């Protein structure tokens, strides 16, 4: 990858936008997670209404040579329904918190989806043939009159219109007391972990009635609680290693070979705080909202409220790279605290070669950082630049003084428009960005 934009780097252009244009967006239609599968041919989104929509990539052809960044609806299904916990008198939302794909082993695709309490394994498969000529049933499924059956028929498979079916294969429930914030498929592709505020469980994909509790930070007295688990992920190559982040801005790396209960970490990553910059908001903005291993497994990336940090797994005392996402908001923390925006959980993602990273911001802005050149760019997901192949213009935020023509004032940013969820194609420069109820797909400009 050459870079993320600006100078001699390639530039990004609009490919598609999915979703309605309505000003009044229904809460159920807000996208809550975005995830490419391992090949990048499928793209899944989950929303607050418990639905999963899967998009399939359009194949390039001679007639449409530039359609590589185009995805069309492949399957839509209701993954979770709202429930009620009668023991605790609590409503359980249907909102999809996370989707994780499993590597494809055969013609079918499998993914895990979770709401606050229940994880489901879904099988997505295609059918283009159907059996006809049953002896005891008509073509529409009704039982035939036994007296009318005069000959033995051999059922045959006949072609039919392609149908994509989504069926739940496993339901993993009743293992989390608190809200699930993360699921991560292990590199053995047989197990996965799920994390809530205080515990992390290890599951086998074939076994639904039990899981192993591998982390438990719940104190004997809940009044002594000082931090919660905010995210967790398995190492991409070592199936015994995983990390989890906390609301105190720390990351713990654990090795399951050391003990069955990984309460004692193998490595502890924390950046010392500068006492001169300490404020009332310091602990809130240091809370980590996302942690992602690089594809190589050498680095991991964490996202807090104002920055993205890249850590070398061999160096625990400080990150090797720090990127400021929206430092201009530091002076606005008081008002962001009052409107609860300071608690927004932004995610982050790597490109396929680990040379660039992407994360979201407010005003439907999203940021990219090139790790090699240290260049960065701010782009906007907007319908105003949604003409096919339209180039995305870099955006700049002005913090004070005279504002240039192409700059936007920090005071005019719309904090209701926020990009929390982004995904980068695992092999190419195609990105998916969720902006409220719309899914934007962009690709690099091909010369």
Curated annotation (Swiss-Prot):
Start and stop residues of the WD repeats: 26-65, 91-132, 175-213, 224-264, 283-321, 338-379, 414-447
Record keyword Cytoplasm present: yes
InterPro entries tied to this protein: PP2A_PR55, PP2A_PR55_CS, WD40/YVTN_repeat-like_dom_sf, WD40_repeat_dom_sf, WD40_rpt
GO cellular component, one term: cytosol
GO biological process: cell division; exit from mitosis; mitotic cell cycle; myoblast fusion; regulation of chromosome segregation
Swiss-Prot/TrEMBL keywords: Cell cycle, Cell division, Cytoplasm, Mitosis, Repeat, WD repeat
PROSITE patterns: PR55_1 (PS01024), PR55_2 (PS01025)
Subcellular location per the Swiss-Prot or TrEMBL entry: Cytoplasm
Source organism, top-level taxon: Eukaryota
GO molecular function terms listed in the Swiss-Prot or TrEMBL record: enzyme-substrate adaptor activity; protein phosphatase regulator activity
Coiled-coil blocks: none
Role according to the record: Substrate-recognition subunit of protein phosphatase 2A (PP2A) that plays a key role in cell cycle by controlling mitosis entry and exit. The activity of PP2A complexes containing PPP2R2D (PR55-delta) fluctuate during the cell cycle: the activity is high in interphase and low in mitosis.
Subunit structure of this chain's protein: PP2A consists of a common heterodimeric core enzyme, composed of a 36 kDa catalytic subunit (subunit C) and a 65 kDa constant regulatory subunit (PR65 or subunit A), that associates with a variety of regulatory subunits.
Protein family membership: Belongs to the phosphatase 2A regulatory subunit B family.
Name of the molecule in the record: Serine/threonine-protein phosphatase 2A 55 kDa regulatory subunit B delta isoform
Organism taxonomic ancestry: Eukaryota, Metazoa, Chordata, Craniata, Vertebrata
